[in-house]
From Swiss-Prot:
Glycans are attached at residues 143, 182, 236, 258, 291, 297, 407, 434, 447, 466, 471. Gene3D superfamilies: Phosphorylase Kinase, domain 1 (3.30.200.20), Ribonuclease Inhibitor (3.80.10.10), Transferase(Phosphotransferase) domain 1 (1.10.510.10). It catalyses: L-seryl-[protein] + ATP = O-phospho-L-seryl-[protein] + ADP + H(+); L-threonyl-[protein] + ATP = O-phospho-L-threonyl-[protein] + ADP + H(+). This is Probable LRR receptor-like serine/threonine-protein kinase At1g07560. Residues 537-871 are cytoplasmic. One of its GO terms (cellular component) is membrane. It comes from Arabidopsis thaliana. LRR repeats lie at residues 413-436, 437-459, 461-482. Residues 570-837 form the Protein kinase domain.
Length: 871
């Protein structure tokens, strides 16, 4: 008998016979990536399938684009005419955001098409996370092949990796994910790798989306030994079992031409030990006469029998084996056998067959993965090997890591991190402390600045720390020095500005590798302080607050004269705004660099103390989400702060005006502002509390990147274990933490409260205080609205419902947690940043799930010897 594969190769094109409006369906949850499509190309609707594809550039950080040549006798739809190939690295991985615990149909398409003019068809492995999924062999399937699996992700991140196994270059044409119902296609263990999916018909039509709402590909298959049944009546496919079989698949069926014979389908397996699941979809599509009976048993070998089965008239049902079957000799035989009392032969409309694929290797501990990826992002690392799972499989371990492996079912843990000689800049980032099993840290021979963070002493697992050859400064935390006495190996050689006491003026010999401050540098600093002290002392004694002679500003930033301030602002020609400090003017430095000049008003409620606080803070901190201080003026009665100019002004202005900020931009702004606060709380030593977080103190540049501003009320905590300080209450009404107001006890959680209020502004576009509401304060109003359970009445109506409801709910819940009356129940800013980034990922994923309509078949085969054949 003729093998089904030969027939499948003949049926290449899907006819388009139904009008578009009948075919229109929802692609909610679909991910359709055109691999190799240029990053700057917009998502497009494929003209034949009407499926919406987008570039894969945002989901992978490696690879190059290629375009296939024309293949005689083959026609490919647009997504399969370009590809991404991977000449560099062994493992190259896509990272997709998915819903944990959801059943997904995952499809990967591969077309070589001699894109490189080498006529060298590749062969490589395909992985899901740390486990092998299948081998892609384009040497055997020269016209292209399709890999398909039904899989339930264990986390919200799914990694699909192409792994080089020989000398040829891996490639991929398209990547597609389709959510399925969670009560369908459930094996006893593992995932289901598709062997074939066919509907029994003599037509040439392949059925997929939108007739199939899950975009399963149903290829036509029929043999001469069979008799075709067809109906023009409606077949009810709304079966309670949830398989959603398309009606086009079940309006035809096959029965044996010889009514006494069984209906038999056989297929070969690649490996004799494969375990098989078969799903039979049956519906009686004939109106049976009173004396007619159709009843049959199903046999899949000596030990597997099921029945009798009597298909329901014009109602589809799905039959499947609940336990996997092993086919003797690697050949499966499925028979539908007529029972003695049946007057009609057996009937079958469609069949799917799968083998189980076990994924025994656990992924690396989720917290370790999150931490190492945050470190990668913070330092802007771009290592070709840093793709996929950090620790497994072991032969693909990320460069610079070592991991601990217990067994395959236990998630590996990261035990050492070596980023020596990696051109790192910036501070030692706080995400390191989230590697809770880290034993060795090597950041030597980089250009790291800032201090040695206190959190290193709190990492109980750390045994070795190498920070030598950097530009670290300040004193080494005493707690860390105490751990050296208890066996910690600490190397800080080659950091000339690092010392071992808070005064940084003594040489200690009790440390492994002491650091000596340069006496010449110290003398220069003292001279600068003295000079500035003299200048400040000359200021008018009429100024309110502590005299300059009592409090000087230590700085290495540019100090401008008042005449220079007049020149850069053209005598204060253009006003940008007004704040508690005074007027803010636009200016230019050197005629090119735009700046904002904040001039202290003689009547300002803020005075020299807050001016000094802001200057000193901005001189010792740097973060991309904090406004940068360009310089200052301190000349007699003239005080001015000179900042980088932020083109789009403050966030509050955008909410009070007519401009509309999209939901994704709002989330980006929230992430930026939260990251700035996180740096103040964790990245600074001692930690800094802003004390005046509000929407008017969040400035936006030309790309809508947000930066925190106005640090005049900020407070540094003393070094030690204190969780709060007692201080006079300062801040802005509406944003002010009630607990801080009542107790005078300030902590970083006071900033968290204020940020929660800002986040509610971002979500609702409502004023913080509105006495026309039943609940004047925004947090109380939102709390009231939440009792009604309708988020649409809370979200800013300017958004017109264009947002991912999941991300909106998550952001709203986060904001309400931040404004909890009890500071103990509020999250820290690191948690806030993490949650907001997840909201952002969900929203970005939504923009790729665009509704489309019709579908067309692909023209690729399943591969060799995995398709059924009739007998």
């Amino acid at each position: 008998m003729k093998n089904l594969r030969g027939l499948l190769l003949a049926f290449l094109v899907l006819s388009l016979g139904i009008s578009d409006f009948l075919r229109a369906q929802d692609q909610q949850g679909f991910i359709s990536l055109d691999c190799g499509l240029q990053a700057d190309e917009s998502p497009y609707t494929e003209p034949l399938t009407k499926l919406t594809f987008t570039s894969d550039a945002d989901f992978i950080k490696s690879g190059k684009s290629g375009k296939i040549q024309n293949v005689p006798g083959m026609e490919y739809i647009k997504p399969y005419t370009v590809l991404r190939y991977f000449p560099d690295g062994v493992r190259n991985c896509y990272t997709l955001i998915v819903i944990q615990g959801t059943n997904y149909l995952i499809v990967a398409m591969f077309t070589y098409g001699n894109y490189d003019n080498l006529n060298t068809h590749p062969k490589f492995d395909l992985y899901l996370g740390p486990n092998i999924w299948t081998t892609v062999d384009l040497q055997r399937n020269v016209n292209g092949t399709r890999a398909e699996i039904i899989h339930i992700p264990r986390s919200t991140s799914l990694q699909i990796c192409l792994v080089k196994t020989g000398t040829t270059t891996p490639l991929i044409s398209a990547l597609e994910l389709r959510p399925l119902r969670n009560n369908t296609y459930i094996p006893q263990s593992g995932s289901l790798k598709t062997l074939f999916r066919v509907h029994l018909t003599d037509s040439k039509e392949t059925v997929r989306y939108p007739e199939d709402v899950h975009d399963r590909l149903w290829s036509p298959f029929f043999m001469p030994e069979w008799r075709l049944l067809r109906t023009s009546l409606t077949v009810n496919t709304s079966d309670d079992n949830g398989y959603d079989i398309p009606e086009d698949v079940v309006v035809t069926a096959a029965t044996p031409a010889n009514v006494s014979s069984p209906l038999t389908i056989s297929w070969n397996l690649e490996t004799p030990d494969d375990l098989v699941y078969a799903y039979l979809h049956v519906a009686e599509i004939q109106s049976l006469r009173e004396n007619d009976t159709r009843e049959f048993n199903i046999s899949a070998g000596q030990d597997v029998n099921y029945g009798p089965v009597s298909p329901d008239e014009f109602l589809v049902g799905t039959l499947f084996n609940t336990s996997p079957v092993k086919c003797e000799g690697g050949t499966c035989h499925l028979q539908l056998i007529k029972t003695p009392k049946s007057t009609l032969p057996p009937l079958l409309n469609a069949i799917e067959a799968f083998i189980t694929v076990e994924f025994p290797q656990s992924e690396t501990n989720a917290n370790d993965v999150l931490a190492i990826k945050s470190i990668e992002t913070s330092y802007g690392l771009s290592r070709i090997s840093w793709q996929g799972d950090p620790c497994v499989p072991q032969q693909l371990l990320w460069d610079g890591l070592t991991c601990e492996y217990t067994n395959m079912s236990t998630p590996p843990r990261i035990h050492s991190l070596d980023l020596s000689s990696s051109e790192l800049t910036g501070i030692i980032v706080p995400e390191i402390q989230n590697l809770t099993e880290l034993k060795k840290l090597d950041f030597s021979n980089n250009n790291l600045t800032g201090g040695v963070p206190e959190f290193l002493a709190k990492m109980k697992s750390l045994l070795v720390i190498n920070l030598s050859g950097n530009n670290l400064s300040g004193s080494v935390p005493q707690a860390l020095l105490n751990k050296v006495k208890n066996g910690l190996k600490l190397n800080i050689q080659g950091n000339p500005n690092l010392c071992f006491s808070s005064s940084c003026n003594k040489k200690k010999n009790s440390i492994m590798l002491p650091v000596v401050a340069s006496l010449a540098s110290l003398a220069a600093i003292i001279a600068m302080i003295a000079l500035l002290f003299v200048c400040i002392k000359r200021r008018s004694s009429s100024r309110k607050g502590p005299s300059p002679s009592q409090q000087s500003i230590e700085t290495i930033k540019k100090r401008y004269t008042y005449a220079e301030v007049l020149a850069m602002t053209k005598k204060f020609e253009r006003v940008l705004g007004k704040g508690g400090f005074g007027m803010v003017y636009h200016g230019y430095i050197n005629g090119t660099e735009e700046v904002a000049v904040k001039l202290l008003s003689p009547s300002s409620a803020q005075g020299y103390k807050e001016f000094k606080t802001e200057v000193e803070l901005l001189l010792r901190v740097y973060h991309t989400n904090l406004v940068s201080l360009v310089g200052y003026c301190d000349e007699k009665d003239h005080l001015a702060l000179i900042y980088q100019y932020m083109v789009n002004g403050d966030l509050k202005k955008h909410f009070s005006g007519s401009s509309i900020i999209s939901w994704v931009d709002r989330l980006n702004i929230a992430v930026d502002a939260a990251s700035g606060l996180e740096y103040l709380h964790i990245g600074c030593k001692p930690l800094i509390v802003h004390r005046d977080v509000k929407s008017s103190n969040i400035l936006l540049d030309d790309q809508l990147q947000a930066k925190l501003a106005d640090f005049g009320l900020s407070r540094s905590f003393p070094i030690g274990d204190e969780s709060h300080v007692s201080t006079l209450v300062a801040g802005t009404f509406g944003y002010l933490d009630h607990e801080y107001y009542q107790t005078n006890r300030l902590s970083e959680k006071s900033d968290v409260y204020s940020f929660g209020v800002v986040l509610l502004e971002i979500i609702t576009n409502k004023p913080v205080i509105d006495h026309n509401r039943d609940m004047p304060h925004i947090a109380e109003w939102v709390k009231l609205m939440l009792t009604r359970g309708d988020i649409s009445n809370i979200m800013d109506p300017k958004l017109q419902g264009v947002y991912d409801s999941g991300s909106a709910w998550k952001a709203l819940e986060l904001a309400m947690t931040c404004v909890n009356p009890s500071s103990l129940k509020r999250p820290n800013m690191s948690h806030v940043v993490h949650e907001l980034k997840e909201c952002l990922v969900s929203e970005n994923n939504r923009t790729r799930d665009i509704d489309t309509s019709r579908s067309m078949d692909i023209n690729l085969s399943f591969g060799t010897d995995v398709n059924p054949k009739a007998r």
